[in-house]
Amino acid sequence: QMGLQLQNTAYSVNIKERLDFSCALFDADGHLIANAPHMPVHLGSMGESIKTVIRENAGVMQPGDVFVLNDPYHGGTHLPDITVITPVYLGDAEVPMFYVGSRGHHADIGGNTPGSMPPFSTRIEEEGVQINNVKLVERGVLREAEMIALLQSGEYPSRNPAQNLADLKAQIAANEKGVQELRKMVDQFGLDVVQAYMRHVQDNAEESVRRVITRLKDGAFTLALDNGAQIQVAIRVDAASRSATIDFTGTSPQQTNNFNAPTAVCMAAVLYVFRTLV
């Protein structure tokens, strides 16, 4: 339902027609509970963005607050993918019990080429406006002027801040749909039951992956890229603990272009591989 809300209310073609967006629910610690079948690279990395908001707003977060970020160093992917995060408060609780998040590919966030993905960029500033843990809504009030000012800042500001703001409002609405449905579920079944079932979902997912791991074998692989770099990965399986270590030692260092994968994207790729095996 969050995804349909976002698709129906978004402004940009990327979200409305190309469906380059994702929505998900997270527990109080920022761990994934459930997601729609959207973009794997979003869903495997969004939790790191949630954890950034939790960590950097501990003790100051309030009901009605909504946060926004696209920072690749804090769970983001590339700068056009903007994440909106809404804490979910229940009753008189002083801390959020859940979080809902939506990530959408905006048509432009600045940078030295339209679309904000210049292949010849050598600095992240050349790709557009970088946003980390910015309060988009404060106690229910949209900080529109502050957001427009941020989108118009930096060396290469957004080319269409009004369109960005329209898509951000759609993401806020999608999140609010998730908040409403969570509250309805808690009202119907009780918080203890809802949290118990959420833990069961997480435990079941973990057990499913551990079963897959026991069928895997150690291996090492190298892929040469056409720019002279290489990706090297090794998997080491510990059958006793039913766990695996994925080691990228030997992979080429960061390149002086925009074809680099931040940590969250690497994690998302690994998680997606395990998902396909379950």
For the regions a language model picked out, list residue spans one by one.
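Alpha-helical support elements that line or immediately flank enzyme active sites
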Residues: 252-278
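Regulatory sensory and allosteric helical modules in signal-transduction proteins
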Residues: 31-35, 47-71
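Gly/Pro-rich active-site capping loops and adjacent beta-alpha segments
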Residues: 95-157, 254-255, 264, 268
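Short, basic/aromatic recognition patches
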Residues: 1-18, 54-58, 68-77
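N-terminal leader/propeptide and maturation segments of large enzyme subunits in energy/redox metabolism
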Residues: 130-206
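A short, polar/charged loop-to-alpha-helix boundary motif
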Residues: 40-53, 107-116
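Accessory "access/gating" subregions that flank catalytic or transport cores
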Residues: 176-254
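A short, hydrophobic, proline-anchored segment that marks a local hinge/packing element in signaling
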Residues: 83-91, 101, 237
